[in-house]
UniProtKB/Swiss-Prot annotation:
Alphabetical list of SUPFAM superfamilies matching this protein: Initiation factor IF2/eIF5b, domain 3, P-loop containing nucleoside triphosphate hydrolases, Translation proteins
G1: annotated segments: 13-20
GO molecular function, one term: GTPase activity
Pfam families reported in the protein's UniProt record: GTP_EFTU, GTP_EFTU_D2, GTP_EFTU_D4, IF-2
One cellular component (GO) term of this entry: cytoplasm
Lineage: superkingdom: Archaea
CDD domains per UniProt: aeIF5B_II, IF2_aeIF5B_IV, IF2_eIF5B
Protein family per UniProt: Belongs to the TRAFAC class translation factor GTPase superfamily. Classic translation factor GTPase family. IF-2 subfamily.
Region (G3): 77-80
Descriptive protein name: Probable translation initiation factor IF-2
Binding site for GTP: 13-20, 77-81, 131-134
Annotated TM spans: none
Amino acid sequence: MKKIRQPIIAVLGHVDHGKTSLLDRIRNTHVAEKEAGGITQHIGATEVPIDVVKQLAGPLLSLWKGEIKLPGLLFIDTPGHEAFTSLRARGGSLADLAILIIDVNEGFQPQTLESIEILRKYKTPFVVAANKIDRIKGWKVVENEPFLVNIKKQDQRAQQDLETKLWELIGKFYELGFQVNRFDRVKDFRKELAIIPISAKYGIGVPELLVLISGLAQKYLEEKLKIEVEGPARGTILEVREEIGFGTTIDVIIYDGTLRKDDTIVVGGKDKAIVTKIRALLKPKPLDEIRDPRYKFDHVNEVSASAGIKIAAPDLEEALAGSPVIAVRDEEELKRARREILEQIKSVIISTDKVGVIVKADTIGSLEALSKELHEKNIPIRKADVGNISKTDVMEALSVKEEEPFYGVVIGFNVKVNEDAEEVAKAKNIPLFVNNIIYKLIEDYEAWIKAEEEKKKKEILANTKFPGVIKLFPDERYVFRRSHPAIVGIEVLEGRIKPGYPLIKQNGDKVGVIKSIKSKEDFLQEAKKGDQVAVAIEGAIVGRHIHPGEILYVDISKDDAIRLVKELRDMLDDTDIEALKNTAKVKAQKDPFWGAL
């Protein structure tokens, strides 16, 4: 028998923009005492029955033509993009819909952009809650009032202020390729993104938000939400945790089928599929019934999607957050489930001996999301695993560093660094990049590479001589001193010269070394093509080794030439290249290497 399940809803947004406040407001919504089904607390989720939505929304339901048939809404309790990336279901996201919350006064922030990127990648439909309208100057607050009623009570200035802030958000979304409008002005919800102005703190606009997501789910996701009630359950692990009296348990969101006490389940482990039998299905007691923290759960015999449930069973110590849970009823289903879970784990947890970065994340879902981003940036991965950054990870990065310094790093999403790992990383100079924003992690890593490349280039530059061709002025008047050192007037014909550069003649014979370069009263660190300067040449005697009108060349080494061609090519201008060609011709007379350059 098929039924429509509650849509699973995630709340995303930047830190302090109101994600938790919104969830708290939804959780603590008071409904009339006579109401049969109130809001119920699941494990890791909050269920809002449709009757509560209807009571809160009242006349707003006319926004949607036809009756809403959903049984309710299931909100994931852990807000933020970290939780969202962990919640996977068959390659996509576990969430059917998302609410992106933005502080209307602060606008877009780094985690806002990260959240939009993730929603776009997972193709998850979402609405925008423009929060903290109560902070707009002069805003009149009426608790739990629908926005469309509340806005009429505001004076012209407050209304205009909100309108300006909304247009700023709309403009930013437009730059990102989204058509957006205030929810009551949207003509087609398939083409336009809806913004609902709200105050999570006071509940203003929350009725519209609940109606809107109920209506969107009903209208566009009905087929996706139809499930086979009697079918075996499928879910995703939110968290693995110890519970007094139960040992290791897993908190699971069930999104398909029915899970029963005594069912056999297959669960994703670090490098295996764990097969175990359910000992207990637990759901939280209502808060007002908890008298003793040891007895905070009620036992249930079965649970149907969508639901958040705690499973107590043997052998769950190595279960992985973010991995699948599949109930099986016979040997054939068991084989299939085991194969499916192993394939999923193997596609995400990587261990190779190739040169690449070390990647760690808190759950298998976030590991998958981070790995995907790195692949898109063509950053190779040597090892990808779940858990905190360990000493072993740092040592692995060290062995990579010896082969390729830019990949000898550890990149960690939403994880901690073990103390011994930090010590080794400092001692061995292994960079650790840790953040809870994926794109920031990659940005930081790329910025580090850029800085390292610049540093390396500077070191190479400091140790590399550039080619240069100079001509002594033919007039004897420009011989200022004949020896110890010889000082003569010259023009740089091609390339560049610097103090310390050795010089050779056209036949390849060594002449001496440039001691200093002077223009009028100033000593220079460099002279380039077209510059007319005086140079002091140590080791040369005018009339014996060098003569007025003679052309001399900077004596670059083979190593200089190789570095110039291979590593500093982008720093050579046309005149440097010309000088290099001329120098190569001179040096080829004595060494065939230069003929092949």
